[in-house]
């Protein structure tokens, strides 16, 4: 359970209704972050931003696709059905690196920024972290192309709460053509 983790580097991408009430989630994640040596937080998620603004964390790195005040910020974002690219700037050093990921969707680019910030917290250079991400092709059941025939592409994604479903649908709307979506309802909360 996350309640027992004592990480050196804690990454918090977002807080959204999933398995517990929002208040329980806020408390759970605040405690998780407070046990870490370094915390990495996404300023593009309102709940995570609130924690970044209210918690007195010893060493905090932030990232964002939008907020110029973040420690790691993306600019010149390019979206394509087969991936994303951007320039990542590290505010503390002024250093920049091009990041290319082979997974589509702004949420995946945000995950890449989180990975870069965590790598920097561990002493990896910005350029090395960006280079390492170029080899990441995604994981099973996350916008995974499972087949195609006659110009029809079948994609499997295990989005299982409203925020994740919205992110997946937003990404799929970047693909050309019509969408036919099937959803298997699962409980959450």
Roles of regions detected by a PLM:
Residues 41-44, 158, 185-186:
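Structural motif
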Residues 3-154, 177:
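Acidic, Mg2+-coordinating active-site environments of NTP-dependent enzymes
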Residues 109-112, 162-166:
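Short glycine/serine/threonine-rich phosphate/pyrophosphate-binding segments
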Residues 139, 163-189:
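Active-site beta-alpha connecting loops in nucleotide-dependent enzymes
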Residues 45-46, 160-164:
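Short beta->alpha connector loops
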